[in-house]
């Protein structure tokens, strides 16, 4: 790694010590007729683990929260929380939200290892149930969390994107399809339930914990960094700690509508290579995309070819509404990327498929280029076995 931090092509964080918390008097209470200083009752789904647990812990320590309702299928360790042990897809959820002012729905299955159809059905059904239950219980506000990936990664993307830019992602790109359906539900809910306000938080590439495992973090588990010829990647990260603090802002009504969250600025591909010490492997688009598509179609990798676009083109977001509300990220892109490298150390993946130790040793010796091109042999072998 370079001893000097690389130049970032955007403004740095203006403050990197602590994220500001919204003042109680600043909380928007107009939608539920509450006067200034009235503390909300907050419910968090998925509170037993992952980002839901991180957010619930922050809310349990926040004096601006009157009461915390933790919802999950099992109990977690959150001081002072009142637990509701249930599946968020259960229609009985409406009866467990009495007196709640805001619901943070964070109970999503984002695992690359889950069966795609079952995962999608769970995520969409869970979100539908939460929105319907909140409206039925008279909850004024719901906060959802998707991803900035819903904007799509296109060569014509502006840098940074406008928070209100249209969603151009393709629905077949792994988890993005689930997130696009959730976005559609978020857009429809206030029209169907006029008293319901829905906030959607869209983080950049998550790093900083097991809940951040994704196609994009596994990109850095490969023996070399795949670069598609002619592309210009721009890397932007969001540490889970920054996402958690942003979700607290949303819970307290400090931000509404569409909210993006990320470290300030971005890193160019050359900076990522310098910081990581990894060498690039540059391949023509036809070879890289064709190989990824064949491997996915045969069930050998969890990532369809469409996901490679997120490593080819920029999809940088500005965190405008959060910044206007006084929020600042604690993590720069350089620090967040360092956390990512620490998390993936010792892991090995190729086209988002996790490899065993023996496979990784072979790849390290043969080189990633040979491995990728050699997937043609894997394809032929699988086809022969299946009689294709």
Protein language model features and the residues they cover:
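Conserved C-terminal active-site "lid" loop/helix of NAD(P)H-dependent oxidoreductases
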Residues: 240, 270-271, 299-328
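Mid/C-terminal beta-alpha module of Rossmann-like enzyme folds, strongest
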Residues: 246-305, 347-355, 380-387
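NAD(P)H-binding glycine-rich loop region in Rossmannoid oxidoreductase-like domains
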Residues: 85-128, 133, 137, 153
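Active-site Tyr-X1-5-Lys
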Residues: 171-199
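Conserved Rossmann-fold NAD(P)-dependent oxidoreductase catalytic core, especially the SDR/UDP-sugar
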Residues: 129-174
